[in-house]
């Protein structure tokens, strides 16, 4: 799901930069891998990775990749509609809605994704592996699982007021 809308200001945040090496006959070949999260702070967020011999080039590639992989995040006011658990690889992430004014209670990579999505009040817990790429993927996976009350009611074939 790619979005082409340059009118909206998209913010980017570098989550991790890794120095990776490949051992070849002549020695070690050095490159850099970047993990970047982008979002418009208004319900759209994406992440991407890039690899190059120079850090700025790796970041540029990661930003390009992230803009191509943006998702819509359903929100209720300043928080998420319901609690969600997700995992990717060894990383497990728990996201819980929080009351208005609570702020973002999340660490590192999860915080970057949540803030750039525009979610202002949420509590999160990172369980298992703390590898940045897996945490970001688990968080995005969790945000993809979120559904608005209207969607849930439609799936169940009942009205929103009947949801308990």
Swiss-Prot record:
Name one process (GO BP) from the record.
Answer: translation
Query: Where does the S5 DRBM domain lie?
Result: 10-73
Family annotation (SUPFAM superfamilies): dsRNA-binding domain-like, Ribosomal protein S5 domain 2-like
Q: What Pfam families does the entry give?
A: Ribosomal_S5 (PF00333), Ribosomal_S5_C (PF03719)
A single Gene Ontology CC term: small ribosomal subunit
TM ranges: none
UniProt keywords, alphabetically:
Ribonucleoprotein, Ribosomal protein, RNA-binding, rRNA-binding
Q: Name one GO molecular function term.
A: structural constituent of ribosome
Q: Which domain of life does the UniProt lineage start with?
A: Bacteria
Role noted for this protein = With S4 and S12 plays an important role in translational accuracy. Located at the back of the 30S subunit body where it stabilizes the conformation of the head with respect to the body.
Q: Which NCBIfam families match?
A: rpsE_bact
UniProt similarity note: Belongs to the universal ribosomal protein uS5 family.
- State the oligomer form and interacting partners: Part of the 30S ribosomal subunit. Contacts proteins S4 and S8.
Query: What's the domain remark here?
Result: The N-terminal domain interacts with the head of the 30S subunit; the C-terminal domain interacts with the body and contacts protein S4. The interaction surface between S4 and S5 is involved in control of translational fidelity.
Q: What is this protein called?
A: Small ribosomal subunit protein uS5
| Gene for this chain | rpsE
